[in-house]
A protein has these predicted regions:
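Nucleotide/phosphate-binding catalytic cleft detector across ATP-hydrolyzing
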Residues: 1-199, 221, 277-282, 286-309, ...
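Conserved acidic E/D residue at the C-terminus of a beta-strand in Rossmann-like folds
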Residues: 9, 203, 225
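Glycine-rich phosphate-binding loop plus the immediately following alpha-helix
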Residues: 15, 38-39, 45, 172, ...
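A cross-taxonomic marker for long C-terminal extensions/tails that follow the last structured domain
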Residues: 193-218
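Short, functional N-terminal and low-complexity linear motifs
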Residues: 201-208, 254-260, 334
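C-terminal amphipathic alpha-helical segment
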Residues: 236-297
């Protein structure tokens, strides 16, 4: 029986998984918990598995605090009820039922993709660094180790698997692996200067930002902190700017377009609001800088002691769009890291702020987790040989 490793990154707005170093897949994490005998007459929007997430998760060996549980996720959950459960920033991730639903759904989807139903799997997952204690890791393992079945009601399919090992890594620290190494695990030449000394990792999620300090590429225990400042904070600022300038109340979709493109959908055209977006990003960077300044006081390390700040996560992306008339990409604002750099260099003009080298900063955690998973598989295979 081959060794199967499922790598997972459970975010606040969406989650990602990959099986045995395969392609990264994104899946939803909004949920509507329902009773097992609930009649769900909704017709899925398509045959895509993500439009058919009416599932029942059952732990078939050992005890569970959370299962069995039937749950709708993604588009079915949104269509069934306006009231959806989403990841909460007011409770530890390791103690939220939705975390375990999301992890096991990602595992089941991965098993479906790879055709490995009924087999043993190991999980590599992430928690906020502040939650990475022995008690929390043991709690996670007690819930996830064992045999499970996931029934997909709309697809009339059932997948089973046995989780034999769970490896828990700190969010952001996993991302740092993707900064230091290419996807083939070769060291990035451009990151050689940061291989020794202190590096701060800032992972800007939808609801929170995780900070962790590395020394010589290794996570320093007890330096993980989580701040209630994330992409949603930036969204609120952007919405306020829109109201201030135009008096308009806009949809969430319009705000997302402005964040990603720097322009606001306006009738059959667009309204340039790059100036307002830059102002909102600067305000967000100022608040993030204040958190970082407070963080360094907490961990007892000065800003001038670090070589670089690695910035990743969906909340750190630059804004641009493709102009079809001009046939070119138009950048409307820099990533948050650029504005954070300006603040940090007021204190230490030699500190570097580094964005994720491979493009989409939202992918840094899952790519780093895959690299960790590949090393895990290689080590296990070596022991068996």
């Amino acid at each position: 029986m081959s060794m199967n490793v499922v790598c997972l990154d459970e975010g606040a707005s969406s989650s990602r998984y990959a099986v045995n170093s395969g392609a990264v897949k994104v899946y939803p994490n909004n949920a509507r918990l329902i009773e097992e005998d609930t009649v769900v007459s909704l017709v899925p929007n398509s045959d895509d598995v993500l439009d058919n997430l009416d599932i029942t998760i059952t732990k078939t060996s050992g005890e569970s605090r959370y299962f069995p549980q039937r749950v709708l996720m993604g588009s079915l959950a949104e269509r069934f009820s306006r009231s959806n459960t989403r990841p909460s920033m007011n409770a530890n991730k390791c103690k939220q039922k939705l975390t375990y639903i999301t992890v096991l759904l990602g595992t089941a989807l991965g098993c479906l993709d790879a055709g490995i139903g009924g087999e043993e799997v190991s999980l590599i997952m992430n928690l906020p660094p502040v939650e990475l204690t022995d008690d929390n890791v043991n709690y996670v393992k007690s819930e996830l180790l064992g045999a499970f079945s996931v029934k997909f009601h709309k697809l009339e399919k059932e997948i089973s698997f046995t989780v034999t090992d769970v490896v828990v890594k700190p969010e952001g620290v996993s991302a740092s692996v993707a900064f230091f190494y290419n996807k083939d695990a070769s060291p990035r030449v451009t990151m050689a200067d940061y291989s020794t000394g202190y590096v701060l990792v800032v992972d800007i999620g939808a609801s929170t930002s995780d900070l962790a300090l590395l020394k010589d590429k290794k996570f320093i225990e007890r330096t993980g902190q989580t701040y209630k400042l994330g992409g949603n904070t930036l969204r609120d600022k952007v919405r306020s700017k829109i109201k201030e300038v135009s008096g308009l109340e806009v949809t969430d979709e319009a705000v997302e377009t402005l964040l990603s493109e720097g322009r606001l959908p306006y009738g059959n055209s667009y309204r340039d609001m790059s100036k307002e977006l830059v102002a909102a990003k600067r305000e967000f960077a100022d608040e993030l800088y204040d958190s970082i300044d407070s963080y360094f006081t907490t961990v007892g390390v000065g800003i001038s002691s670090i070589k670089a700040v690695f910035v990743c996560g969906g909340g750190s992306m630059e804004s641009s769009y493709f102009d079809e008339k001009e046939n070119k990409e138009v950048k409307t604002s820099e990533p948050v890291s650029k504005y954070l750099l300006e603040r940090l260099q007021e204190v230490c003009d030699s500190v570097d702020v580094v964005s994720y080298p491979d493009g989409n900063p939202r992918m840094a955690n899952i790519i780093g987790t895959i690299l960790i998973g590949n090393a895990y598989r290689a080590k296990k295979a070596q022991k068996k040989a």
